[in-house]
């Protein structure tokens, strides 16, 4: 779904303090020492719930979002949420993940910038973390999700589900905390990035960093319309080519006759020649 703005687009799509919370709930889960070094002195997590937890907490399902997702897995595009839930057709009463039966939890991942601590959050010095935000791993992210699980007093998830980068976190759960899940549902994911994925993503990173408005990652205080939108747009175009099938790409971008013209007619070629 495309998002339209009446004026220049905001410098960032991140949720920030003071924005409408929407359906988000928040919990502070303490400090974390990170796998690659460094630490975060306090981690706040934004999460949403759907359905009702039963008396013995046996009907809980955890949903893992992909790289650019958030906690809004289901629900309307209301205050605090620019779009409908990204799995809105799957989660709800009578749907595949039936909230008449299941209690569903989805949290914004560590570093995700949609309410959970990330580069757009305020650092202890009062500035946005921006370029100073430390590197985090899937292991760090799942550690925070495990703390959220403990906070919610859920002993074992009936299932954990996720696709893409979310699927990587599902796999991490299965490896690190197998006694805390009954089943794992991994969609379009892998235990590690392949060489071609690393190569493509390095090109995406270069596209973003080459945008002068990237400002080395410290662009949060810029005015509307002055963010790294061009670089991000190019990176997104790269991304669109990496998770589409050949058939779909042909439908979207394949050669096609223009304006109902017959490319084999004599008049078509005369017209095309004159226009050169």
Residue ranges and their predicted role:
Residues 18, 198-276:
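Alpha/beta-hydrolase
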Residues 107, 185-188, 241:
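Alpha/beta-hydrolase-fold catalytic nucleophile elbow
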Residues 126-132, 139-159, 178:
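Conserved acidic catalytic loop of the alpha/beta-hydrolase fold
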Residues 155-200:
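Conserved hydrolase catalytic core segment
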């Amino acid at each position: 779904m495309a998002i339209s703005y009446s004026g220049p687009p905001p410098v960032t799509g991140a949720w920030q303090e003071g924005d409408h919370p929407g359906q988000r709930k928040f919990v502070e889960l303490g400090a974390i020492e990170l796998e690659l070094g460094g630490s975060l002195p306090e981690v706040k997590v934004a999460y949403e719930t759907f359905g009702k937890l039963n008396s013995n907490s046996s009907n809980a399902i955890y949903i893992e979002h992909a790289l650019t997702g958030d906690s809004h897995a289901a629900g309307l595009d209301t205050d605090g949420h620019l779009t409908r839930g990204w799995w809105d057709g799957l989660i709800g009463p009578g749907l595949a993940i039936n909230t008449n039966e299941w209690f569903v939890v989805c949290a914004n991942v560590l570093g995700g910038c949609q309410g959970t601590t990330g580069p757009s959050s305020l650092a202890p010095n009062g500035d946005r973390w921006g370029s100073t935000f430390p590197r985090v791993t899937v292991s760090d992210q799942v550690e925070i999700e495990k703390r959220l699980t403990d906070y919610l007093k859920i002993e074992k998830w009936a299932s954990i589900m996720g696709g893409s980068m979310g699927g990587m976190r599902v796999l991490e759960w299965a490896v690190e905390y197998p006694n805390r899940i009954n089943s794992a549902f991994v969609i379009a994911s892998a235990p590690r990035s392949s060489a071609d994925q690393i190569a493509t993503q390095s090109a995406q990173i270069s596209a973003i960093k080459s945008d002068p408005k990237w400002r080395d990652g410290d662009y949060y205080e810029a005015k509307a319309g002055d963010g790294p939108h061009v670089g991000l747009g190019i990176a997104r175009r790269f991304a669109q080519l990496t998770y589409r099938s050949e058939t779909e790409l042909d439908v979207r971008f394949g050669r096609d006759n223009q304006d109902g013209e017959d490319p084999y007619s004599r008049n078509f070629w005369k017209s095309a020649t004159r226009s050169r």
